[in-house]
Structures are given as C-alpha cells and as structure tokens.
Amino acid sequence: MTIKQTHSFQTEVSQLLHLMIHSLYSNKEIFLRELISNASDAVDKLKFKSLSDDTLIEGKEALQIHIDVNKDANTITITDNGIGMSEVEVNKNIGTIANSGTKKFLKSLNETQAQDSNLIGQFGVGFYSSFIVSDKVEIITRKAGSKSKKGTKWASTGKGKYSIESIDRPDFGTSVILHIKKDEKEFLDDYRLRNIISKYSDHITVPIMMVKVSEDNKDIEYERINKANAFWAQDKQDLKQKDYDEFYKSLTYDLEAPLTQLHNRVEGNIDYTSLLFIPSKSPFDIWEPKRKGGIKLYAKRVFIMEDNEALMPLYLRFVKGVIDTADLSLNLSREILQDNKVIKAIRKASVKRILSVLEKMAKNKPEDYATFWQEFGMLMKEGVVEDTINKDKIAKLLRFTTNKSKNATQTVTLEHYIKNIQKDQKAIYYITAETYETAKGSPHLENFNQKNIEVLLLSDRVDEWMVSNFREFDGIQLKSIAKGNLEDFDSKEEKKAKEEVAKNFEIVIEKMQKILDSQVKEIKISSRLSESPSCLVADENEMGGNMERIMKSLGQDIPDTKPILEINPTHSLVKKLKTKIDEDLVKVLFDQAVLSEGGQLKDPAEFVKRINKLIN
C-alpha cells in the first residue's frame, strides 16, 4: 500500500462505538486497562513465537510496554515491542468483527448492559474503548519478523470511517496514539495514569514503563510502574484474600470476588503451580459454543495458550485461573497438547481438586454452594454424563427440587432422596417439563402426591439430556413417571377395585380408540391419575413429549410415534362416556392431556369450539 485508503466501519463496530461512548462514561478509565491488556498479549505472543524462531526478536531490547504522555499535543501513547501486525492483520482485526458470537452479543446488548465494562474486555473488543476519551486514535504497527522496515498506520475519529496507509517504522511492535478530548484532560495527568495502572494492571507480567518524574526535567528515564511478577508463584502463606480477589478481577474482568480459589504447588513426578478460581457469577456467554476458556497455560512463566479443552473438561468451563509448569516443552502445538502426558496428569489432578473443594463447600458453606449451584448447576448436570471417571462424585453434588419442595429452588440431593425413599420403592422417580410450574402441576404426579412418594421435578434445559444418559444412582434406577408402566403401590383391595373398573370401561376404550386412532397408540385406564381426567404417557423406550418439543425446537427430525392416552375412570367427564360416547368430549380429553404436559394444540380454535359446545 502506497497511498492512504479510507474504509467504513462494519455495522457492529459502529454500534459498539456508540454504546461505549454513550454508556461507559461512568467508567472511562477502563480504556487504559484494555490497551495494556492488548499490549501484554502482543508481547506474550512474541515470546512464545520466538522460542521456535529467535530471529523475531531484533537485538537485546527487553520486552516492555511504554506509556508516554505529551500534554502539549494532548496525546497518550501506549507502545509495546510485541508481535505487531501486518497490513492484512490490521485490515482484519481493526474496523471489523469476525467472531459470530461477538456479533450476536452486540446485537442483543442494550445501553444498560453496556455500562458493564467487563463485558467489553471479556469479548476481546476492548481496543474500541479508546474512543471514550479520544476524538482521534492512531495505530502504528509493524509485524515482528517482517523484512521490510515499512509499517502500517491506521487512524480514525470513530465516526464511521477509518484510514490505512503504509509508513516507515524501523521497530517491530505497536503504538496506539490517543488524541485526548478537551474534557478528558484528567487522563494526561501522570499521577492519574499511575493510579489506573496500579488498580487494573499491577499483575500484568510484562513491565509497564513510564517516564520517571525528575526535579530538573532534563533527563528522560523510565521506571517500572507495575509489580510485573507471576502472582501465582508467590507463597500462599504471604497472600491475603484481598490479594487473591484483586488478581482474580484483573485476570477475568469480573467485578465480583470469586466464591473460592485453589492455590497449589505440586512437586514430584510433575512440577507445577495452579491457581484456579470458582466465580460467584456465571458469565453471560457460558452457553456460547465458541466462547474462550478460562485457564491460561504457562511453561516456566512463559505464556503458552488459553482456551484449550485439554486443560479443563467442558463442564468446568466456568473455572478461571492459571496453570504454570516447568515440565512442558515450550514449542508444543495446540494439537500435540491434547495428548501430552503432563497436561493429562495436571488436568486429572485439577478436576479432582475442584470437585473436592465443591464437596467441602456443600458440606461446610451451604450458602456459598447454593450460590454456586444457582449459577453453575446446569454445567454439573452436564458433567455427571460427560465425566464417567468422576460420575459418582458429581452425582453427589447435584441438587434438585421435588414435589415436596416449597418452591423451585434446587436443594434436594440424591442421597437425601434415597434416605427418605418409601419402603417398597424400587426407583428414583422424576418428571421432565419445560418449566417448573408445568412439572409441579403435572397430572402424572397425582397418585405420587397422594401416596407421599417424592418425585424430582426437572425443568432445566439440560435435564432431558442428563436423564437420557444418567440412569442410576447408588444402584437405584432413575425412572420417568410419564413413561411406561410404574410399580404398583396399591393395596390388594385397591388393585381389585381398579381391575373391576377397567373391565367396565373396555367398550368405552374401544370406541375412544376409533375416534383417536390417528393420534394415539393406545388408550388405557390410568394408575397415575386421581384428580385429572386424562394424561399422555410414552412407551418405556420412546421419546417423551418434552423431549420431542426440545428436538423440534432445534430443527431435529423425530421418530413418528404416538403417545398412550390414559384416562381416569373416577372423573365425572370420563364417567359420562359410559352413558354416551361424545366425539367432542373424547377429543377434548386428548387435547387437555396435551396442554397439561406443556404441549401445543394443532388447532386451538377447534378446541375452544368443543369446550364452548360442551359447556352449553
């Protein structure tokens, strides 16, 4: 490129800039945190790449971040001698947002949510926070290893367009030049900037340098502002909870302190240090398939990578922290890392340690565990299926609400359920539904409520998948009360009475079957109902109604099966059918059963007509 070219910002970038400028006015200082974080990443990348290509680092200059203030020009310049960017990378990374998850996030973000500056850092678009305090921003950069001494200059006022041109730049790395707005000159104050660095970036491992203030102002000498140490390498005996909380916040951009942390130094066959945090709040993008992981991997304090499932199983993706080992080759590729014996051993030990801490929390700090479960319970339900090695440990950490619970809060353990099981009960019973209210009001529960049998009410979006794969606990089978035949809790007298009733309804059932033949597989007398007239049941090995609805919502094909309609012979509506088979009433009984399990009618208007007709 030899001439300046002008481009328009991508729509999402313009939206982001608008949100930042108008919504982050109460926390403007975060611009420096974001730019220092980007500079630190650039230095870490150069360190890593230079391990396999020492020509990338020119000369013996220390890798640092410099912050320079020019009050006459109203500028702040943040310079790093990290990896730098090529012209192609500038075009790709600045002015556009390629990540689909980020685009989706921006589309849903409103101005109130945008006031949470940590969302900006978590999504990796923090550079644009520069425009909160600047009316013009310039980037001058040159890629490390580039044979040409030419660099790339990017410039914008943040008003819809930006320019790119080629310029001379003898050194590799990146400089970000902020032209500070007239009403933001407080950020040109040396003391103010040092305070911001101390607040947000003290634990950045790259030295952050500023000009040392001297009395004669003649000699320009730089001094390090941040501690620039590996926080996790410190002895935990020397650290206070406040220190951990501050490091956690600087690492994760979380405003809240973590629930707890695990700080361990392991020496033996494998030497490593791990500092892992369990957050108190779930990130908003926890269900994004391509979200970044929370564990950073270091080898001898050299940053290697993050966002690698080799470091932590998917169900523990909420865990944040650092793992640093001396027993890892520094030139491992991401692919090789997956099968590395050292990483596998560290991962196994870390998972065991995390589950142990959660177990102790549940026992000794139930309020903290209740907070954890509310935020991350669904992920633990993933884990009981995915982690076959630790399945039993995870199962003991699960919490549920039941038909005996006062509300939807999940507090009941499987151990508690078994302890209070009925004398002749052979299964752990559950029902799945789209909502807690639908589960709680399900007609399938009626006989269980009457006989004081506890039933798990499952309405989390992972529950159907969990019970399809997690089928027994402590030797006792988990069984849906909306599927197949149930064990009989009736007395001999009750059984005999029901058998007599069933015989009296044989002709009624035959006639009902003809009317509903295209909609149901079978009609039979129910052992589940005591108050409602009807309910739908699936065969033992077939998909239930709730699972069918979930699959349909995901656009998945489902097997062409029909449910079983169960009727309650003691209900007045069903008794009417013994006198006369009313086709409208039969169809209403079926539609009512569909609605009671949270389903949707194919023709609601026709249902209303039938109801009105029956009422009249």
UniProtKB/Swiss-Prot annotation:
<comment type="function">
    <text>Molecular chaperone. Has ATPase activity.</text>
</comment>
<keyword id="KW-0346">Stress response</keyword>
<keyword id="KW-0143">Chaperone</keyword>
<dbReference type="InterPro" id="IPR037196">
    <property type="entry name" value="HSP90_C"/>
</dbReference>
<dbReference type="InterPro" id="IPR019805">
    <property type="entry name" value="Heat_shock_protein_90_CS"/>
</dbReference>
<dbReference type="GO" id="GO:0016887">
    <property type="term" value="F:ATP hydrolysis activity"/>
</dbReference>
<protein>
    <recommendedName>
        <fullName>Chaperone protein HtpG</fullName>
    </recommendedName>
</protein>
<comment type="subunit">
    <text>Homodimer.</text>
</comment>
<feature type="region of interest" description="A; substrate-binding">
    <location>
        <begin position="1"/>
        <end position="334"/>
    </location>
</feature>
<dbReference type="InterPro" id="IPR036890">
    <property type="entry name" value="HATPase_C_sf"/>
</dbReference>
<comment type="similarity">
    <text>Belongs to the heat shock protein 90 family.</text>
</comment>
<dbReference type="InterPro" id="IPR001404">
    <property type="entry name" value="Hsp90_fam"/>
</dbReference>
<keyword id="KW-0067">ATP-binding</keyword>
<keyword id="KW-0963">Cytoplasm</keyword>
<dbReference type="GO" id="GO:0051082">
    <property type="term" value="F:unfolded protein binding"/>
</dbReference>
<dbReference type="GO" id="GO:0140662">
    <property type="term" value="F:ATP-dependent protein folding chaperone"/>
</dbReference>
<keyword id="KW-0547">Nucleotide-binding</keyword>
<feature type="region of interest" description="C">
    <location>
        <begin position="550"/>
        <end position="616"/>
    </location>
</feature>
<feature type="region of interest" description="B">
    <location>
        <begin position="335"/>
        <end position="549"/>
    </location>
</feature>
<dbReference type="Pfam" id="PF00183">
    <property type="entry name" value="HSP90"/>
</dbReference>
<dbReference type="Pfam" id="PF13589">
    <property type="entry name" value="HATPase_c_3"/>
</dbReference>
<dbReference type="GO" id="GO:0005524">
    <property type="term" value="F:ATP binding"/>
</dbReference>
<dbReference type="InterPro" id="IPR020575">
    <property type="entry name" value="Hsp90_N"/>
</dbReference>
<dbReference type="GO" id="GO:0005737">
    <property type="term" value="C:cytoplasm"/>
</dbReference>
<dbReference type="InterPro" id="IPR020568">
    <property type="entry name" value="Ribosomal_Su5_D2-typ_SF"/>
</dbReference>
